[in-house]
């Protein structure tokens, strides 16, 4: 299930575009997630009171969390699959403290793909989308394996 060097290059090329403006990318990813899957909002005490897109756009906490999410994901992607050290604490907190099911990781992955398609159509063609999907699937599978080790059935 690993990615080729060429696929990792496609992933990291488009991720460079994300890093040029992490706050707006992160905010848009979370807003898409929450609008498309309102049940995910319930896992976030800081955001669950936000009902409208305007309220979400105005929330500094939501923007900060978007930065946190995409910064962590960027660190993982840059490891090109050698991300054990990064995955372990992330899985620990998401399994034991936040109780985020793997399904929600799938949903946020979909939101990430949609935001990249929307913001970077010229840099995110079919090959790049396929590579990013594989990279996000690798991340989710490794998170799920850690969840299992921790006894979390998420």
UniProtKB/Swiss-Prot annotation:
Assembly description: Monomeric.
Coiled-coil features, chain-numbered ranges: none
Localization of this protein: Cytoplasm, Sarcoplasm
Principal EC category: oxidoreductase
Described function: Monomeric heme protein which primary function is to store oxygen and facilitate its diffusion within muscle tissues. Reversibly binds oxygen through a pentacoordinated heme iron and enables its timely and efficient release as needed during periods of heightened demand. Depending on the oxidative conditions of tissues and cells, and in addition to its ability to bind oxygen, it also has a nitrite reductase activity whereby it regulates the production of bioactive nitric oxide.
Naturally occurring in which organism (per UniProt): Macaca fascicularis (Crab-eating macaque)
Gene Ontology MF: a single term: oxygen carrier activity
SUPFAM superfamilies listed in its UniProt record: Globin-like
EC number assigned by the record: 1.7.-.-, 1.11.1.-
Name under which the protein is recorded: Myoglobin
Alphabetical keyword list: Cytoplasm, Heme, Iron, Metal-binding, Muscle protein, Oxidoreductase, Oxygen transport, Phosphoprotein, Transport
């Amino acid at each position: 299930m690993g990615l080729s060097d060429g696929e990792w290059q496609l992933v990291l090329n488009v991720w460079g575009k994300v890093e040029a403006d992490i706050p707006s990318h992160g905010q848009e990813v979370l807003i898409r997630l929450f609008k498309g899957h309102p049940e995910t909002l319930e896992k976030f005490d800081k955001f669950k009171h936000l009902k409208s897109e305007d309220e979400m756009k105005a929330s500094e906490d939501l923007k900060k969390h978007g930065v946190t999410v995409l910064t962590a994901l960027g660190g993982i992607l840059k490891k090109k699959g050698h991300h054990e050290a990064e995955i372990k604490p992330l899985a620990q907190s998401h399994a034991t403290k936040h109780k985020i099911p793997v399904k929600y990781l799938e949903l946020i992955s979909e939101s990430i793909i949609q935001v990249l398609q929307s913001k970077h159509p010229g840099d995110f063609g079919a090959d790049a989308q396929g590579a990013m999907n594989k990279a996000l699937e690798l991340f989710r599978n490794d998170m799920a394996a850690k969840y299992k080790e921790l006894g979390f059935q998420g």
